[in-house]
Amino acid sequence: MIRLFIDTATKTFALGARVDDKEKTIDLGNPKKVLELTHVGIQKLGEERNFTRPEIKEYYCLLGPGSNTGIRLGLTIPRTVYAMDPTIRIYGIETRKLLSAEADSAVLSDRNGNLFYFDKDRKESHIRIRKEDIASYPFKGTIAVEDSDSVSKEALKGKNIVSVNVLSLRRKHKDLFIDFSDKEEEYLPEYARKI
């Protein structure tokens, strides 16, 4: 089975494919060109791993908050495919839940350099922290930071950070993802359901 991972919540827009036991990730770069580059990225992954878009049966998305508006963009790609092929499965997870699966808390920066703090024990989904307040913020335990998030890593220098790869976490914590496949009425526009 071919699985596609769509990372819309970290600093770079990335696609990752898992075919059998082999993985490949590509960075699509400029978030402003994401929708135009997605098809090209999927095609490139397919050429490198010998599959075509119709063979992708599972889509995994980060739902934000984060750099590229999370749920809006993260689910737009697979739900467009879903409108044409309702047999695909769509899974999503809040970025904080995935990152926090590896540490006591997590920090993620968006493309504007804002920092978001997630703590497993807090009721709020996230707290926005100014860079100048990082040094005095009472972090607890280990802090998960995405591998490519240089803004968060720099701001947290000297703190107990754990660098994580979201594609690897998707594989490791698949059970944490929410299955949106049978809930299309909750996220698919009405006109698409009538096609």
Tell where the protein language model's regions lie, with residue ranges.
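Alpha-helix N-cap/loop-to-helix initiation residues
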Residues: 31-34, 67, 99
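DPxDG-like acidic metal-binding loop motif
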Residues: 58-90
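Oxyanion-binding and handling regions
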Residues: 1-20, 90-195
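Short glycine-/small-residue-rich flexible loop motifs, especially phosphate/cofactor-binding loops
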Residues: 43, 79, 153
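Short linear motifs in exposed loops
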Residues: 27, 72, 128-129
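Short amphipathic alpha-helical face segments that pack within enzyme cores
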Residues: 37-40, 72, 76-80, 97-98
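N-terminal beta-alpha supersecondary unit
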Residues: 1-61, 142-145
